[in-house]
């Protein structure tokens, strides 16, 4: 398995990529799209019923338990938090989870990762290679998302085109990737709001990456 040193290096690299989303993604998005594509206006998202909102985390949690149990620590928390919010009967718990609790956990996680990473361990060739590999995967994921939308548009009707600027949101940096879609879209059309469209692939990216990681861990363990 991965040693503690590599785990710390990977954790620091992951946080670095999250912070670098506004730097890495916009040039790739502009490079791979035309001005016409950036101006595509999408239909408003459909209204989701309360029943669907409640059933989604329940079904997702059950499928994770059966199919990818090793991904449960991450996806379980995602679905549990979603259920707290959407159920409508645990408002105080939902407010605590998305406010004081997540702030406390974020501080403790940052302190733990930072305190356990010494310069002598982190500033090594292995660390640089890990960071470079992660950055490359980040770039490939961003480009792949944009290109996939462009390919998908080839088979869609004129009125159902998807703005390729939301393709970058498939990278599971929530909600930063979706915000970048919104910011770049507003640069070319101040009335074209892509945020809610981009949140779909953004959350799907979280679920997909966690499932993929769970499957990989299943093979390694």
Each language-model region and where it sits:
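Juxtamembrane and boundary regions of transmembrane helices in multi-pass small-molecule transporters
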Residues: 8-38, 144-158, 201-221
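Entry/N-cap segments of selected transmembrane alpha helices
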Residues: 13, 17, 119-146, 198-202
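Membrane-embedded hairpin module used as a gating/binding unit in multi-pass transport
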Residues: 16-89
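Short helical (or helix-break) motifs at transmembrane helix termini and adjacent helical loops
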Residues: 23-27, 171-187
């Amino acid at each position: 398995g991965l040693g503690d040193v590599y785990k710390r290096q990977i954790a620091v690299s992951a946080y670095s990529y999250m912070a670098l989303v506004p730097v890495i993604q916009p040039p790739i998005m502009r490079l791979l799209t035309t001005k016409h594509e950036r101006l595509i206006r999408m239909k408003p998202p459909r209204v989701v019923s309360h029943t669907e909102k409640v059933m989604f985390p329940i079904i997702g949690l059950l499928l994770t338990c059966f199919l990818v149990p090793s991904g449960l620590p991450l996806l379980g928390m995602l679905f549990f938090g979603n259920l707290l919010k959407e159920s409508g009967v645990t408002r105080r718990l939902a407010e605590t989870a998305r406010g004081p609790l997540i702030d406390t956990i974020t501080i403790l996680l940052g302190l733990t990762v930072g305190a356990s990473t010494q310069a002598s361990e982190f500033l090594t060739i292995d660390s640089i290679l890990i960071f470079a590999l992660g950055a490359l995967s980040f770039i490939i994921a961003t480009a792949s998302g944009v290109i996939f939308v462009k390919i998908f548009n080839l088979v869609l009707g004129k009125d159902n085109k998807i703005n390729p600027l939301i393709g970058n949101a498939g990278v599971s940096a929530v909600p930063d990737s979706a915000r970048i879609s919104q910011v770049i879209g507003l640069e070319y059309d101040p009335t074209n709001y892509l945020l809610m469209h981009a949140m779909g692939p953004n959350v799907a990216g979280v679920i997909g990456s966690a499932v993929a990681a769970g499957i990989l861990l299943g093979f390694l363990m």
